[in-house]
Amino acid sequence: MRNASKKHLDLPYRPGVGMMILNADNHIFVGKRIDTKISAWQMPQGGIVPGETPSIAAMREMLEEIGSDKGYIIAESKCWYSYDLPSFLIPKLWNGNFRGQKQRWFLIRFTGNNEDININTSNPEFDQWRWASLNELLSIIIPFKRKLYQAVVKEFDSLIQ
């Protein structure tokens, strides 16, 4: 891995979930990360609390990150997807205990309105949000997550059309 040093490769992946949230027009929710100066757009994601199932974690994280849990799960990924953080980020996230995340992904149909979305939560992760087309998603996503996103899009593509 060009992003991770040998020491970092010995670290485990943090277990988590990712959510591809679709609106009625089959556009995908993306948020711009609040903790960076670069244009870092991503789909909502988060950790799994011990004892929590991935599907419960996905709906909890949806509420925590977009301020709404108005939606339902269409599909769960068949496998765990992982990504490695760039080396410079490892010491800054999760106390330096993880090299990246392994995630179970969920395709979720958002049943609310735009007014139901509130990214100004108690621990905000995004300072902007919008709906992106499937094609646009891969062009705006933060580069080190692009390969993972391509795999998730490939798996869920037939369910989005």
Swiss-Prot record:
Signal peptide: none
Cofactor(s) needed by this chain: a divalent metal cation
Start and end residues of each Nudix hydrolase domain: 12-154
A Gene Ontology BP annotation from the UniProt entry: mRNA catabolic process
Record-linked InterPro entries: NUDIX_hydrolase-like_dom_sf, NUDIX_hydrolase_CS, NUDIX_hydrolase_dom, RppH
Pfam families given in the database record: NUDIX
EC identifiers of the protein: 3.6.1.-
A molecular-function term among this protein's GO annotations: mRNA 5'-diphosphatase activity
Motif (Nudix box): 46-67
Domain of life (superkingdom): Bacteria
Swiss-Prot/TrEMBL keywords: Hydrolase
One CC-aspect GO term: cytoplasm
Record function comment: Accelerates the degradation of transcripts by removing pyrophosphate from the 5'-end of triphosphorylated RNA, leading to a more labile monophosphorylated state that can stimulate subsequent ribonuclease cleavage.
UniProt-listed HAMAP family: Nudix_RppH
NCBIfam families xrefs: PRK00714.1-3, PRK00714.1-5
Similarity comment: Belongs to the Nudix hydrolase family. RppH subfamily.
Protein name: RNA pyrophosphohydrolase
Species whose genome carries this gene: Rickettsia canadensis (strain McKiel)
Phylogenetic lineage: Bacteria, Pseudomonadati, Pseudomonadota, Alphaproteobacteria, Rickettsiales
